[in-house]
Curated annotation (Swiss-Prot):
Subunit-level organization: Homodimer.
One Gene Ontology cellular component: cytosol
The protein, known as: Serine hydroxymethyltransferase
UniProt family annotation: Belongs to the SHMT family.
UniProt-recorded Gene Ontology molecular function terms: glycine hydroxymethyltransferase activity; pyridoxal phosphate binding
Length: 415
């Protein structure tokens, strides 16, 4: 038995069950991924014990020379990977990364343009229930009703009318390529700075499969998980002129001591992202997403904007009796994990929704390829045709488990 199993069998059991879920179920939540053993080892290291307020070479505590090494590695690797002037790897999350950027250039009450949450944006892009919507005057933009892609005519009209100090670009549920150059043109017309939140597409950007926002934005934020396949955390890239202000808005502005074990894991993940095989992995994510989208359309599902250019797609259930909530719950019983999601021009509550979101990063990490996407689409279609039949859903789960056992990832942790 392990030390944890001996001392705290309840926690050990929960970890084991979660490992089994990740190993044998089909993980299709677009914002989730599975890290490598090297990342897990770094995050579970003694770096967790060290307080290191401040920045490398300028700490408020002694004994920081080793943690300085890993933070400097993470910074330099991030700059190399994305071609950025400056990187801050201390944010605990993507939300705190966004908060630090806002506080670097905005005052309470300033106007920002951000993507409407129900059109694919994120809570921190100005949702009224979030700090971003409470501190700032938010003008939301969205997608065209005809194409379900970003309506740049609307973005320009709103920018000219409201003269925002910042335009927030990026999304949590947008399946198409984002035209950063078009946003830059609009921002320059009104003297606005741009913050791009590339949390979902950072891995694709790193691999050259999505245009980079770095040349077009004063600030770029990201999480280090999702497509980047690192530990849960945040990161900020910015132009050199903003580096000092940005750093002070992370510490001491909104955070105290950084999580050095997580920063060590970020450094490892960023090294992985610099390897040639990472580009092949990201290409497979996109191939799988396109294959899965095609297979779902063949089976009669309607996808927001008709398909995908990246790692995710949104299934639109408007006009059917199904809700996103029922779809999520039914698929979970079938061993398939997705999340309910609002769709553009949503008519249902965000707790019910008219859609669900699917992403391929985690399944691709397991090793699934285009050939398996037909099976995955079949499982989804069959499960959603049997939402009231628990026995059938359990039978589908058995077949999902058989499929996933062909693609082991953490099986050695269960032996």
């Amino acid at each position: 038995m392990s030390i944890l199993e001996t001392f705290d069998p309840q926690v050990a059991e929960a970890i084991r069950h979660e490992t089994e879920r990740q190993e044998y179920n089909l993980e299709l939540i677009a914002s989730e991924n599975f890290v490598s053993e090297a990342v897990l080892e770094a995050q579970g290291s003694v770096m967790t014990n060290k307080y290191a307020e401040g920045y490398p070479g300028k700490r408020y505590y002694g004994g920081c020379h080793h943690v300085d090494v890993v933070e400097n590695l993470a910074i330099e690797r991030a700059k190399e990977l994305f071609g950025a002037d400056h990187a801050n790897v201390q944010p605990h999350s993507g939300s705190q990364a966004n908060m630090a950027v806002y506080f670097s250039v905005l005052k309470p009450g300033d106007t920002i343009l951000g993507m409407n949450l129900s059109h694919g944006g994120h809570l921190t892009h100005g949702s009224p229930v979030n700090f971003s919507g409470r501190f700032f005057n938010v003008v939301p933009y969205g997608v065209s009703q005809e194409t379900e892609t970003i309506d740049f005519n609307e973005v320009e009209r709103l920018a000219l009318e409201h003269k925002p100090k910042m335009i927030v670009v990026g999304a949590s549920a947008y399946p198409r390529t984002i035209d950063f150059a078009a946003f830059r043109i609009i921002a320059d017309k009104v003297g606005a700075v741009i913050m791009v939140d590339m949390a979902h597409i950072a891995g694709l950007v790193a691999a050259g499969l999505h245009p980079s926002p770095v040349p077009y934005a004063e600030f770029v934020t990201t999480t280090t998980h999702k497509t980047l396949r690192g530990p849960r955390g945040g990161m900020i890239l910015c132009r050199e002129e903003y580096a000092k202000t940005l750093n002070s808005n992370i510490f001491p502005g909104i955070q105290g001591g950084p999580l050095m074990h997580v920063i060590a894991a970020k450094a490892v993940a960023l090294k992985e992202a610099l390897q040639p095989e990472f580009k092949a992995y990201q290409a497979q994510i996109v191939k799988n997403a396109k294959a899965l989208a095609d297979e779902l359309v063949k089976r009669g599902f309607r996808l927001v904007s008709g398909g995908t250019d990246n790692h995710l797609m949104l299934v639109n259930l408007t006009g059917t009796e199904l809700t996103g909530k029922v779809a999520e719950e039914s698929l979970d019983k079938a061993g398939i994990t997705v999340n309910k999601n609002t769709v553009p021009f949503e008519t249902r509550s965000p707790f019910v929704t008219s859609g669900f979101r699917i992403g391929t990063p985690a399944a691709t990490t397991h090793g699934l390829k285009e050939a398996e996407m037909a099976d995955v689409a079949g499982f989804i279609a069959e499960a959603l045709a049997n939402v009231d039949n628990d026995a059938k859903l359990a039978e589908i789960k058995g077949r999902v488990n058989v499929l996933m056992k062909r693609f082991p990832l953490y099986a050695h942790r269960l032996s």
